[in-house]
């Protein structure tokens, strides 16, 4: 049958010129338009391996320690919504270690950029609860319009925490598109009523204490 017919293909090797490769892609595109298949076979070492991004920052705080401190400060009625990637993994681990359960957690796994609006939705529909959104700088960058929307609504039981390491650490550590951006200034500019920039564990403990309702 047709499935056993020789499939048209092209072997890609370093000896090929850019023109030859371009012509090969043209043939492949034509075959696909005709509803046929086309395969590219890559010789060993055809692709060059680039050096892995070296992930470094000069932050004095460690994300896992910050997450642990936040979870330790929670009241039983509080809710945590965490963004995708390592933040949710560490929220899961620290909640397990500190509380022995995940009853307060909503882990936004696979929903990069959506944690803040999910947290806002919970806050709006459960005003008796305090909702902590643990966001990452890369995830927050995905849907920055949500900051302006949330600020306009002025929720009184919503705490938005951006853990900024200036990198997409979960997928290799490449820098985000806004290295050096002050997320605190962005939040202040769009209308967040109270904004804190935290650089030490002592500052974190103080702010977590100060923002609790009296």
Predicted regions and their residues:
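Structural signature of the thiamine diphosphate
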Residues: 8-54, 184-214
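General beta-strand structural signal in soluble alpha/beta enzymes
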Residues: 10-12, 40-42, 79-84, 106-110, ...
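Short beta-strand segments
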Residues: 39-43, 81-83, 134-135, 159-164, ...
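Short, glycine/polar-rich helix-capping loops at beta-to-alpha or helix-loop-helix junctions
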Residues: 91, 176-189
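Short, small-residue-biased leader/transition segments that mark boundaries at the very start
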Residues: 3-4
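Short acidic, glycine/serine/threonine-rich loops at helix termini
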Residues: 23, 50-55, 91-95, 144-145, ...
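Thiamine diphosphate
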Residues: 92-165
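Active-site diphosphate/adenylate-binding microenvironment
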Residues: 50-112
